[in-house]
Amino acid sequence: MPGIVVFRRRWSVGSDDLVLPAIFLFLLHTTWFVILSVVLFGLVYNPHEACSLNLVDHGRGYLGILLSCMIAEMAIIWLSMRGGILYTEPRDSMQYVLYVRLAILVIEFIYAIVGIVWLTQYYTSCNDLTAKNVTLGMVVCNWVVILSVCITVLCVFDPTGRTFVKLRATKRRQRNLRTYNLRHRLEEGQATSWSRRLKVFLCCTRTKDSQSDAYSEIAYLFAEFFRDLDIVPSDIIAGLVLLRQRQRAKRNAVLDEANNDILAFLSGMPVTRNTKYLDLKNSQEMLRYKEVCYYMLFALAAYGWPMYLMRKPACGLCQLARSCSCCLCPARPRFAPGVTIEEDNCCGCNAIAIRRHFLDENMTAVDIVYTSCHDAVYETPFYVAVDHDKKKVVISIRGTLSPKDALTDLTGDAERLPVEGHHGTWLGHKGMVLSAEYIKKKLEQEMVLSQAFGRDLGRGTKHYGLIVVGHSLGAGTAAILSFLLRPQYPTLKCFAYSPPGGLLSEDAMEYSKEFVTAVVLGKDLVPRIGLSQLEGFRRQLLDVLQRSTKPKWRIIVGATKCIPKSELPEEVEVTTLASTRLWTHPSDLTIALSASTPLYPPGRIIHVVHNHPAEQCCCCEQEEPTYFAIWGDNKAFNEVIISPAMLHEHLPYVVMEGLNKVLENYNKGKTALLSAAKVMVSPTEVDLTPELIFQQQPLPTGPPMPTGLALELPTADHRNSSVRSKSQSEMSLEGFSEGRLLSPVVAAAARQDPVELLLLSTQERLAAELQARRAPLATMESLSDTESLYSFDSRRSSGFRSIRGSPSLHAVLERDEGHLFYIDPAIPEENPSLSSRTELLAADSLSKHSQDTQPLEAALGSGGVTPERPPSAAANDEEEEVGGGGGGPASRGELALHNGRLGDSPSPQVLEFAEFIDSLFNLDSKSSSFQDLYCMVVPESPTSDYAEGPKSPSQQEILLRAQFEPNLVPKPPRLFAGSADPSSGISLSPSFPLSSSGELMDLTPTGLSSQECLAADKIRTSTPTGHGASPAKQDELVISAR
């Protein structure tokens, strides 16, 4: 709430902040009230002892004081828990209760003095031990309470509180001139107050001119940021809790919407179809990513001995102590003669820690050339090393580790980059621009780079490349230093880890993408804060505080992990509150900082995100997240994402662990992901053994009206689907009625191989899925890592699940169960070395061989009735045999086996589907977009290989409505393929991290109008012999892969 006004002065504490202090004092005074009551009325005192009589009189008076304190504190607790953060009317009487409590405190002070007098007179002479101990306890307790109150008053004292109250009163009287004067006095007073706080914060440091300037700039920045802002520190804490809940609610609402392209949120960032994952299957991309991980070690080493001991608290101290030579120890040579160390401590701990860091990582080919431990405002420590393995000279700059570094961080105004030819157009963070200029000047004065490139001419150090790295403050300084050094070193590269968000202007940011690679981990706070980002954060914080109706203590308590409770009001309530309470502080939401140039993070950003499991209670063990690497947009880091990890994920060793986990997930999940992908498209997997067992199914009694083909999978859990790898393939044909003629559809289907029937039957399942259900939406963060593989298949698939036994499809199959024939192939042994194309081609040839070597009567089994073929179908076969059929083998009855494999040419349907699977899972190292993979069209050819009756109006209406009604078609799965395996950290493609199943349901690809989607698509013409076209071909829905 706004600061409470007591004694006509504003204080930096709210009336709703007194709940916990009042509860603490109430419990303390209640305890003493009980103890003193027992001592006074439960014990018998000697009437001849003067000390005992004085104790009784003093105790009775103190009982009355304790009772008054308890009543006043109960009133404070009751009032503090009323109202909301900015709804202060129920707490208006708080100041009068405080007046009463302060009066009681004065009486307590007097009684504490009396207690000290009693102790000095009777403590040694009094024989009553109980009286002495009780009096001593009361006096100590009184003085502790009095000192606590005095310290609290000093902490919450606002030097500008009197001016603030006058300014608010003058605003109400609309005196413009006096308002301007009071506002100016208020800003000056706040700047002076902030400057005093900074000096107290850095009380042990020597003040220089540059440091004094930094004090002034930062003080005015804070004064401008908090000017006219009547909130207290606890309000900011409650606002962060509310803002986090609002952000999570917005993300869930976006995922629940049907008309958007956002598929999921990873680490708070939206994942769309255009999200680009790092293609770690590409050798060049993998080398580049490993290079990023490698140079993170140099950035980590720049922090010296504090970070070394933080990473290795047990043995790190012993390893440093063995190499250290303190000023009291005899000097001994510790470094090579060519190493320069500037302003290290007497033991040389920083330089030794840097060297030990590389030795522990087995990087013995790294030589340290220069180490500067000089630390001041705008002067950041750094070191220069030569890496003979990589043939690079590395400049590593330390991040924020001292209060002086914090002053450099906070000096965030825009400053022109001192680069020739770009005066005024390239801007950067002022503190880091000055730090980069200092390092460049130091390198030139000490000729450090000349020493590094001439370190060992025999190894060719003269031709080594230059690398600049840094983390946090060092990352921003390294990026700007790269601008300054690039004219002399055109091949320079820079790796900036967790760089600040307000670093470069837009023009400079675009240019930095040529040589700067930045890394951001998860919800890191630093890459998302700059002056422009803080303005938006300030407005959001004030807005969420105004909309809240709950007491502050409930909001803060509800933020604990084990008591999740959303305190956001409902939307209807929010609108009414916003309109009725806006007058309370009309200027707060309209106040903005001085016009600041938007600044962005540098370079090409690798954003390491993770699919975090669902939060569990504090008593449950949390699952490990799965990490992925995507290419981030510099302008997307414009909002602070409130999270408990926003500070933790900025630590340098945490960033290094995140980078390494991406590689670990990739290495562990590379084989498992391909196996899982094959299980998802199991209709294309047919056992490669030459034996195919046809089993006769029970014949239906009803009239045969075949409507399609279904793949029958076991109803067990998908987790056990790969167990069937060694079983034999079994196919069953069903739907041939005894004593009846087969329809032309069944006759045509009997002449086709089972694989082609499986592929072409997908169209009917898709139509059934469109009618039966809509794909559910789900957030990524709601899925655990262990179930992400199966969620990818069973919960998210919309296309292939239709031919794998989805619940909605089973309802369709049960209605027409008597008119279907089933194929139940076993899943073959999962061999990652076999691509889907190899399996498809072999399976296609195998199925042709089985059909041609065995007549249909044998397939139906003994005792079965051979159906008569319609005259139209027989005529088509004769025409195909005469016409040659377009490139098929010369004889259908002759199939050659070469090296144990079938040598027949596969059908175009299988070839096309194989290319579709290969491009989908990137088995041939191809990269294409989702829009180029799928297209669902309605052919205009009047004939079809499978004659069907004209489509019903309802089916045609579904196809047409699907082009214009997005809600009719389930959205693509809100999951990326990288989580298909719990330990997998890779995506199936750099451009589409999604499964193919969900995308098949998208009837309107981006960039195609509904008319184009309904345009004609010619049926394939190059069919093998024996697969001719039927003259009665109708329009049907087919799937084609471009």
UniProtKB/Swiss-Prot annotation:
Cofactor(s) the record lists: Ca(2+)
Gene this chain is encoded by: DAGLA
Residues carrying covalently attached carbohydrate according to the record: N133
Any Pfam family matching the protein: Lipase_3
Cytoplasmic side: 1-22, 82-101, 158-1042
Any one GO biological process: retrograde trans-synaptic signaling by endocannabinoid
Role according to the record: Serine hydrolase that hydrolyzes arachidonic acid-esterified diacylglycerols (DAGs) to produce the principal endocannabinoid, 2-arachidonoylglycerol (2-AG). Preferentially hydrolyzes sn-1 fatty acids from diacylglycerols (DAG) that contain arachidonic acid (AA) esterified at the sn-2 position to biosynthesize 2-AG. Has negligible activity against other lipids including monoacylglycerols and phospholipids. Plays a key role in regulating 2-AG signaling in the central nervous system (CNS). Regulates 2-AG involved in retrograde suppression at central synapses.
Family note: Belongs to the AB hydrolase superfamily. Lipase family.
Post-translational modification: Phosphorylated at Ser-782 and Ser-808 by CAMK2A; phosphorylation by CAMK2A inhibits diacylglycerol lipase activity.
UniProt-listed SUPFAM superfamilies: alpha/beta-Hydrolases
pH dependence (record): Optimum pH is 7.0.
Signal peptide residues on this chain, from the entry's feature table: none
One CC-aspect GO term: dendritic spine membrane
Catalytic-site annotation from UniProt: S472 (charge relay system), D524 (charge relay system)
UniProt cross-references to InterPro entries, sorted A to Z: AB_hydrolase_fold, DAG_Lipase-Related, Fungal_lipase-type
Keywords: Calcium, Cell membrane, Cell projection, Disease variant, Endosome, Glycoprotein, Hydrolase, Intellectual disability, Lipid degradation, Lipid metabolism, Membrane, Metal-binding, Neurodegeneration, Phosphoprotein, Postsynaptic cell membrane, Spinocerebellar ataxia, Synapse, Transmembrane, Transmembrane helix
Location relative to the cell: Cell membrane; Postsynaptic density membrane; Early endosome membrane; Cell projection, Dendritic spine membrane
Catalytic activity: a 1,2-diacyl-sn-glycerol + H2O = a 2-acylglycerol + a fatty acid + H(+); 1-octadecanoyl-2-(5Z,8Z,11Z,14Z-eicosatetraenoyl)-sn-glycerol + H2O = 2-(5Z,8Z,11Z,14Z-eicosatetraenoyl)-glycerol + octadecanoate + H(+); 1,2-di-(9Z-octadecenoyl)-sn-glycerol + H2O = 2-(9Z-octadecenoyl)-glycerol + (9Z)-octadecenoate + H(+); 1-(9Z-octadecenoyl)-2-(5Z,8Z,11Z,14Z-eicosatetraenoyl)-sn-glycerol + H2O = 2-(5Z,8Z,11Z,14Z-eicosatetraenoyl)-glycerol + (9Z)-octadecenoate + H(+)
Membrane topology: Multi-pass membrane protein
Gene Ontology molecular functions: lipoprotein lipase activity; metal ion binding; monoacylglycerol lipase activity
Record note on what altering S808E does: Phosphomimetic mutation; decreased the Vmax of 2-AG production without affecting the KM
Disease annotated for this entry: Spinocerebellar ataxia 20: Spinocerebellar ataxia is a clinically and genetically heterogeneous group of cerebellar disorders. Patients show progressive incoordination of gait and often poor coordination of hands, speech and eye movements, due to degeneration of the cerebellum with variable involvement of the brainstem and spinal cord. SCA20 is an autosomal dominant, adult-onset form characterized by dysarthria due to spasmodic dysphonia followed by slowly progressive ataxia.
Sequence positions bearing Phosphoserine: S727, S729, S732, S743, S782, S784, S806, S808, S833, S847, S952
The protein, known as: Diacylglycerol lipase-alpha
Transmembrane spans: 23-43, 61-81, 102-122, 137-157
Regulation: Inhibited by 1,2,3-triazole urea covalent inhibitors KT172, DH376 and DO34. Inhibited by p-hydroxy-mercuri-benzoate and HgCl(2), but not to PMSF. Also inhibited by RHC80267. Diacylglycerol lipase activity is inhibited by the phosphorylation of Ser-782 and Ser-808 by CAMK2A.
